[in-house]
């Protein structure tokens, strides 16, 4: 029988990375909110770790957003590590493609509770609890931005290691990837009980035997990253049973909203309906939202939506003064997927094949 313990698994913090797909205004509270979003998300990771009294936080790569990490981002990261350390939480980290080992770093001292895996070989570090080994954590970092080798094949579990955790920043998408490509079979062959992966920004549990988990990123950054973002709280029982709980950490959420235009004949009616749904969305998520509005269906508004001027007018009407709200819901894009209405009676009168098809449908009416 082993020892019960728990940890937070997060990855891809991308501290300081600016949002894409949105133009920030020159004034209003949202400028500051967007600028601090990635930092606030990591604060919420540490909050969750402290509130749940976990034994460790595992960070599986890409703490920063590039080889040259800003000093402010490094100081903010160190500040949160010290906060976790004060709560008795151990930190285990591997470097990824956005924060490789050779990247510049300021000489900022980190707590003794921070363990960073080297890039030269897979190493193991015990996770201690109450003076006893609760688990063994294996990991390897990126030395450079691109790693074409299959690093998963370098992991080998040792005997008597208790619960074994592997940490790797990897792309399971294909052998030609420059981001430590591997397969699920490669990971399973290492004999780990839990794989704490990073690199993929959408959370995904690849396997439950053993657990192979991507937590996704902690804060959405663009329209490609729709929906809740966060980390996993992982509870490991005395007999090695694993329980996952997803914890939302994003402070601003990217969302899709789909509207069928069939019920509306006037632009003002559509704007009113969207505004009403926006209010419900704010209440549902409890945080600011950046929204892609997708219009579908058919009706009189198809002509408005099919023109760029029409779409711009709707967006401007929806966003008027919204940037001055703390709990904003900003429509960043309007996608027209509507179609023109079809009048079957008129079509039947056409002499060509366009009219013959609806004529043939009369027998079903």
Where are the predicted features?
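Conserved residues at the C-terminal ends of beta-strands
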Residues: 60, 198, 296
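N-terminal active-site segment of His-dependent metallophosphoesterases
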Residues: 1-74
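Short loop/turn motifs at secondary-structure junctions
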Residues: 4, 53, 133-136, 191, ...
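Amphipathic, non-transmembrane alpha-helical secondary structure
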Residues: 39, 43-50, 75-78, 152-156, ...
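Domain-start "cap" segments at the beginnings of catalytic or binding domains
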Residues: 1-30, 229, 235-260
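His/Asp/Glu-rich metal-coordinating catalytic cores
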Residues: 20, 26-28, 56, 67-243
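Accessory, non-catalytic peripheral segments of nucleic-acid enzymes
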Residues: 249-365
